[in-house]
């Protein structure tokens, strides 16, 4: 199974999935893309708490069935039964999507459980690219190092991040101009990797002995965008785990 973590959207994100795919051919195209891309889905059993990981194993377009891999962790499989509805969350073209499947069969193949259900009648998704913001927890120190146009280097702490940009806390004596272009020499991600790119300062203001900046990415390579997406998912997953403990 793909190791990239799946995560359900926050209520704000889920509420913004106001576009619908209802045409059968388009639904099949989306599901096939998720299956071929080995997209990891986050699954929630209706009327139950908790989220589990699964993937699409097979799409039977002729008979109109969808087959899902065994839920992980294992306690998810123990909770599922025929007649229940699985709500599934994932990404299609890097945009969040949601659909539901009624489980009509629970089977096993080579020691691994699977679930079958009819094709969903609707897929909800965000049609336009949305920059969902993930926040960096206080216990996690992710650094960002910027180089200004005059060559000065300034390092600070990453506070939030999205596919569109980031927020950071910089030293109190930092000076930034709105619309100033800076080089992001290193922006640390939760997986200990760092990306480099260019960014435009959108705003800056003093706060609690620091300077908070908001920046928009201006040049972001496809590989860096994929790394960012994975980082955002991981940060949201950590926040969900924290909320469940609280």
Curated annotation (Swiss-Prot):
PilZ domain span: 128-232
Keyword Nucleotide-binding: yes
A matching Pfam family: PilZN
Subcellular location: Bacterial flagellum basal body
Superkingdom of origin organism: Bacteria
A GO term for molecular function: cyclic-di-GMP binding
Main location: other
GO biological process, any: bacterial-type flagellum-dependent cell motility
Keyword annotations from UniProtKB, A to Z: Bacterial flagellum, c-di-GMP, Nucleotide-binding
Cellular component per GO, a single term: bacterial-type flagellum basal body
InterPro entries named among the record's database cross-references: PilZ_domain, Split_barrel_FMN-bd, T3SS_YcgR, T3SS_YcgR_PilZN
Keyword presence, Methyltransferase: no
Subunit text: Monomer. Interacts with the flagellar basal bodies.
Similarity remark: Belongs to the YcgR family.
Function statement: Acts as a flagellar brake, regulating swimming and swarming in a bis-(3'-5') cyclic diguanylic acid (c-di-GMP)-dependent manner. Binds 1 c-di-GMP dimer per subunit. Increasing levels of c-di-GMP lead to decreased motility.
Protein name: Flagellar brake protein YcgR
């Amino acid at each position: 199974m793909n190791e990239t973590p799946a995560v359900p959207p926050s209520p704000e994100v889920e509420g913004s999935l106001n576009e619908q795919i209802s045409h059968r051919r388009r639904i099949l195209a989306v599901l096939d893309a998720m299956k071929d891309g080995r997209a990891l889905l986050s699954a929630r059993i209706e009327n139950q708490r908790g989220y589990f990981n699964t993937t699409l194993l097979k799409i039977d377009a002729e008979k109109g069935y969808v087959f899902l891999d065994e839920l992980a962790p294992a306690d998810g499989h123990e909770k599922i039964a025929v007649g229940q509805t699985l709500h599934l969350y994932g990404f299609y073209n890097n945009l969040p999507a949601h659909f539901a499947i009624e489980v009509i069969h629970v089977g096993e193949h080579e020691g691994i459980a699977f679930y079958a259900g009819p094709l969903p009648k609707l897929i909800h998704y965000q049609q336009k690219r949305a920059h969902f913001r993930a926040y960096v927890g206080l216990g996690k120190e992710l650094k960002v190092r910027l180089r200004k146009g005059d060559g000065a280097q300034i390092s600070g702490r990453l506070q939030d991040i999205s596919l569109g940009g980031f927020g950071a806390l910089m030293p109190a004596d930092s000076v930034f101009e709105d619309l100033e272009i800076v080089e992001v020499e290193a922006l640390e991600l939760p997986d200990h990797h760092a990306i480099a790119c260019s960014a435009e300062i959108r705003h800056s203001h003093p706060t609690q002995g620091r300077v908070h900046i908001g920046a928009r990415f201006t040049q972001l390579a496809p590989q860096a965008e994929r790394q960012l997406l994975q980082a955002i998912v991981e940060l949201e997953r950590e926040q969900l785990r924290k909320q469940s403990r609280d």
